[in-house]
């Protein structure tokens, strides 16, 4: 799983919106997210934080190759040290011990109660599409978000056989809009690994010619804590609220 530069920039903007105070922010990531950026880009992306606290990955060359980044990208930042430097404690879960994982969980099933409303930011770096019980997996992400916290998804929209599913904008728009969240971003992300960019797509209206190999990126904020239910598609009368 990986987070491209536009998503990392979005995370920086989210962290700036969350109350800093004296409390460190709590982040949950559904699988370990490789960060597809150079350590040299850190001061521009996180100008209010000390880049000296962020360690480069010893396996940067292998990660660059795996994700199609050019060698000129240089060293990539270590995920934990970056989140630590920006004032966040990150918890990483996965179904297997793949890389740096804190806890083994099966996201096809409901998470344990200690996850409920426990995190300021929940990250899905491209995981829910690999879970067959995808509705429950997205519900797990939503229920883990604390009041006024955020959830970010980055999943395939037109990446065939990447996972079990390609996802449409209306999925996240309807699910979060109907469950006490406020939508902050709905976009496609496309382009080569070193130059990905957001592209506008309609949230609920039918459209054609989706960008090839595109990801669906959504950000929502939990403005009202309630039981998470199953949405009705806007096309068939689903209402916000």
Where are these regions (language model features)?
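Class I SAM-dependent methyltransferase Rossmann-like catalytic core
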Residues: 1-29, 34-47
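A structural signal for well-ordered alpha-helical segments within the folded catalytic domains
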Residues: 5, 9-12, 77-80, 139, ...
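Conserved SAM-binding loop
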Residues: 27, 74-161
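Residue-level detector of flexible, active-site-proximal loop/helix-junction positions
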Residues: 34, 97-99, 109, 188-193
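Short, glycine/serine-rich, charged loops/turns that create anion-binding
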Residues: 34-35, 97, 158, 224
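Aromatic- and Gly/Pro-rich amphipathic surface segment
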Residues: 35-91
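A short acidic (Asp/Glu
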Residues: 39-42, 102-103, 163-165
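S-adenosyl-L-methionine-dependent methyltransferase catalytic module, highlighting the catalytic core
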Residues: 67-73, 84-86, 132-241
């Amino acid at each position: 799983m990986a987070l491209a530069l536009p998503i990392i920039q979005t995370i920086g903007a989210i962290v700036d919106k969350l109350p800093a105070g004296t409390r460190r922010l709590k982040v949950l990531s559904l699988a370990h997210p490789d960060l597809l950026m150079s350590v040299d880009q850190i001061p521009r992306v996180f100008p209010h934080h000390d880049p000296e606290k962020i360690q480069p990955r010893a396996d940067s060359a292998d990660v660059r190759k795996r994700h199609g980044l050019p060698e000129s990208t240089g060293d990539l930042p270590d995920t934990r040290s970056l989140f630590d430097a920006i004032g966040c404690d990150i918890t990483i879960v996965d179904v297997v011990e793949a890389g740096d994982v804190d806890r083994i969980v099966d996201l096809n099933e409901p998470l344990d109660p200690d996850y409920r409303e426990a995190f300021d930011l929940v990250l899905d770096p491209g995981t829910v599409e690999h879970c067959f019980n995808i509705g429950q997996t997205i519900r797990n992400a939503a229920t883990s978000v604390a009041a006024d916290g955020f959830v970010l998804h980055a999943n395939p929209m037109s990446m065939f056989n990447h996972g079990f599913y390609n996802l449409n904008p209306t999925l996240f728009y309807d699910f979060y809009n109907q469950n006490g969240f406020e939508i902050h971003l709905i976009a496609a992300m496309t382009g080569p690994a070193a130059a990905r960019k957001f592209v506008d797509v309609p949230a609920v209206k039918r459209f054609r010619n989706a960008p090839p190999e595109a990801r669906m990126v959504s950000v929502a904020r939990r403005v009202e804590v309630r039981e998470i239910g199953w949405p009705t598609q806007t096309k068939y009368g689903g209402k916000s609220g």
